[in-house]
């Protein structure tokens, strides 16, 4: 047990401080903006301090544990704790949310509510990544939906209500299966229902029940990740949402599904995961190709980037399905790498479309001349997304490749076939990204329009872009910085699959 409640403070601080926004003096938006950014920054500094001085990397066990009785009637506890799996995701959440808050600077309509919802999301995400009770995990999973729905439906494009409704229907539908799985786990095999993850790790289930529970959880994660065919909410949502909301969706929300798949399905249901893993790898390989081909056919450049996200999630699914030390570490690396790259591409797409008031590629062209800074950063992050050596995307995809090749679970022919499919997906990625860059930035179409007055990136936007570019390069050059966080925990987790 930790003597100081670091994690409780990290979970409660954003939503509590966010609720005070409504009591700030009504003297324009500047006070609200600076207050929100200060809270995000304070939270990020607190978590960095707590993890630097109170977390031992070489210890694969759960650390900074907290356990408080919450509801007496059915023994429900507020249980928090972190390990190497959740550490990277929590730091990513703090980093991206702070920069997304800074990205939301131009928001003036209902700005108090907007910033409160962003802080409420922050609490939900930190709570999910640090919860050690399955019911608390589910509550945090659901807490996320309300702010996202409101952010989508109130700030965005013309079809924002349609995309917000589609998002809530998909995620609420997945949550029903999640809740059934939670209840099934809690009520099985004991007179007193308990959902402590420490106890559930040692719980064994009949084969049929374990497969049903696994499948129920998988549907919920398949919506969030997303896994095809439950992905269609994502392009609509990213096409309509404000770019600061897109940063949170692409950077953190999609990663919650991957985290749940590792934390719940792999850790608590190892036998079912061992059975399902070949199917996960096949689905991941199909997803890489399918989403890349679909992305190539998109006229709206925001939707093209959204489908590229779906394609990159395929590598995470393959890494999780490979059941190897290398593959799972590669999946965790890809979670963080895509968190940085995906969030930035949506930020760049949003800022560019705000300036041009255009999103269709055939209407664009020649904007590299009036907007050289946006062009440079867009090109740099597109290169990171297509896995250019020296950037985080390359290392993550390469490690997942090696994880699949070294997996003892698969025979040589299936390995060769899936590797071939992944390679085709990696070839398609530069095709759709570079063709998007060519259509947007090269040529003379918009440059020759009379009275066209395009403004390049300002200091605030450049600061956000450089802040994210540094870790992308850093992870690409020295991936061990991230892998060292999770390597011991991954080894402990996989000991359930391959006992020594």
UniProtKB/Swiss-Prot annotation:
GO terms for cellular component: chloroplast thylakoid membrane. It is a multi-pass membrane protein. Its main location: plastid. Keywords: Chloroplast, Membrane, NAD, NADP, Plastid, Plastoquinone, Quinone, Thylakoid, Translocase, Transmembrane, Transmembrane helix. It holds the Pfam family Proton_antipo_M. Its EC number is 7.1.1.-. One of its GO terms (biological process) is ATP synthesis coupled electron transport. Belongs to the complex I subunit 4 family. PANTHER family: NAD(P)H-QUINONE OXIDOREDUCTASE CHAIN 4, CHLOROPLASTIC, NADH-UBIQUINONE OXIDOREDUCTASE CHAIN 4. This is NAD(P)H-quinone oxidoreductase chain 4, chloroplastic. The gene is ndhD.
